Amino acid sequence: MQVLVRDNNVDQALRVLKKKMQREGVFREMKQRRSYEKPSERKTREKSEAIRRARKLARKQAIREGLLPAPPKKKLPERKPPLPQTAARPAG
């Protein structure tokens, strides 16, 4: 996996690399490979993941077709207005 470092900006390159690794599923695979997973456990996990994906897809399809209401959008907390600035005291 390659990431370009532009203008010696290593922080930005690291963020891009992390995002790429997340998309590829590298972190998930590393977590799974920490310990041995029996083939039967792997099969049940993969089956449950497939069921979860199918349910999610069906739910999105139903929302798109209007059979289910769309989930309510999360409300952002209201910002407080900034405090009024007081006049600077004269030195002396």
From Swiss-Prot:
Report a single Gene Ontology molecular function: structural constituent of ribosome
Gene3D superfamilies registered for this protein in UniProt: Ribosomal protein S8
Quote the PANTHER family the UniProt record gives.
Answer: MITOCHONDRIAL 28S RIBOSOMAL PROTEIN S21, SMALL RIBOSOMAL SUBUNIT PROTEIN BS21M
Encoding gene (name)? rpsU1
Annotated spans, Disordered: 25-92
The name this protein goes by in its record? Small ribosomal subunit protein bS21A
Where is there biased composition of kind Basic and acidic residues?
25-52
Which Gene Ontology cellular-component terms appear in the entry? ribonucleoprotein complex; ribosome
Record keywords: Ribonucleoprotein, Ribosomal protein
Q: Which GO terms describe its biological process?
A: translation
Keyword Manganese listed:
no
According to its UniProt entry, this protein's organism is Bradyrhizobium diazoefficiens (strain JCM 10833 / BCRC 13528 / IAM 13628 / NBRC 14792 / USDA 110)
